[in-house]
Regions:
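Short substrate-entry loop that stabilizes the transition state in hydrolases
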Residues: 84-86, 91-133, 207-208
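N-terminal cap/lid segment of alpha/beta-hydrolase-fold proteins
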Residues: 38-83
Length: 322
């Protein structure tokens, strides 16, 4: 090999060595189904106080982190003042762009309302939000990753060192996307017993095709990676059925309450009605409340909905381990 050839070979080798290697995700469609969620083991723990954010005569509010899979997930925690024991509730917020999301954002009025009435409240930010860890495959996980974070939030609360918490009384409350996540958790067999009941405000559809049609089609940034991963619903209907909780209502093991405004333009009331029909058809305990003239964010009926929710959670505490 001549001198020039050796130099070219060396330059080529250096170029290859310094060029970042693009690694495709090893994630498979089978890993992001409800069956996969049902088969998981959960490790929610290490609930850690990071910073005192506020203190009132009724509670303290802290930024926190907890363990979910191999990630650190952030959130906010409210601890009522007093001897307790206080019941607990995990809150799951609706969709907010992660680029603008702030710690504890999304259900602040519910946080204050519940904490002021004697609930230990853990509001999860989910992975990829606020100052928690990121999951590069999150966009392809059909909210099963956020569902995992919710389940682990319940377990982290139960495994915490909060002495005033009644660890046998923990419920879930979710709104919009967080409501749809609640459906996932409610049908996940491996999450049985983590939450004593589910309260869902204006949930997204329990048929994932409906969610994709509304927010995915026509939005290449969202749709293209998903379509490349699993295909369109009409191309791969069996997969899309496998991520839709409406096909798993028989697996629900805790009572569900749904609040929905009949003028909701974001999550149409027909989605909630379809879920209610499916749950009733499966013989599950459901309390379904429609608020006339209300949109996606309940206004006039919100106080009544929260009072109903507290009563519902109180009637459905289960004293069983997960």
């Amino acid at each position: 090999m001549g001198k020039r050839s050796k130099i070219l070979a060396l330059l080529l080798a250096l170029t290859l060595a310094l060029t970042p290697v693009s690694t495709a995700s090893a994630l498979t469609p089978a890993e992001v189904t409800i069956d996969a969620l049902s088969a998981k083991s959960f490790n929610g723990a290490e609930l850690t106080l990071i910073k005192l954010l506020a203190e009132t005569s009724k509670y303290t509010k802290h930024s926190v982190t907890y363990r979910s899979e191999n990630l650190k997930v952030s959130g906010v925690l409210y601890i009522p003042k007093g001897k307790g024991p206080f019941p607990g509730v995990v809150l799951g917020h609706g969709y907010i762009d992660t680029k603008i999301y702030k710690n504890g954002q999304g259900m602040r009025r519910e946080q204050d309302y519940l904490a002021a009435r004697g609930f230990v409240v853990l509001h999860t930010d989910y992975r990829n939000h606020s100052f928690g860890d990121d999951d590069p495959d999150s966009q392809l996980k059909f909210r099963m990753d956020y569902s995992t974070d919710v389940i682990n939030a319940g377990l982290a609360l139960r495994n915490s060192k909060i002495r005033t918490l009644d660890k046998k009384k923990i419920a879930y409350m979710g709104r919009s996307m967080g409501g749809g996540i609640g459906f996932n958790v409610a049908v996940a067999k491996s999450a049985k017993g983590v939450f004593s009941s589910f309260v869902l405000f204006a949930p997204t559809s329990a048929n994932y095709v409906e969610n994709f049609n509304k927010w995915g089609r026509g939005n290449p940034e969202r749709a293209n990676p998903i379509v490349k991963f699993v295909g369109l619903p009409e191309e791969n209907p069996s997969f899309w059925a496998s991520v839709s909780p409406e096909n798993y209502w028989s697996q629900v093991s805790a009572p569900i309450m749904i609040h929905h405004g009949d003028k909701d333009e974001s999550c149409p009331i027909r989605w909630a009605r379809a879920a209610a029909q499916g749950l009733n058809g499966a013989g599950k305990e459901l309390s379904f409340h429609i608020y006339r003239g209300e949109g996606h964010n309940l206004m006039a009926g919100w106080g009544k909905a929260m009072a109903r929710s507290i009563d519902f959670m109180g009637r459905n505490w289960q004293r069983s381990e997960p």
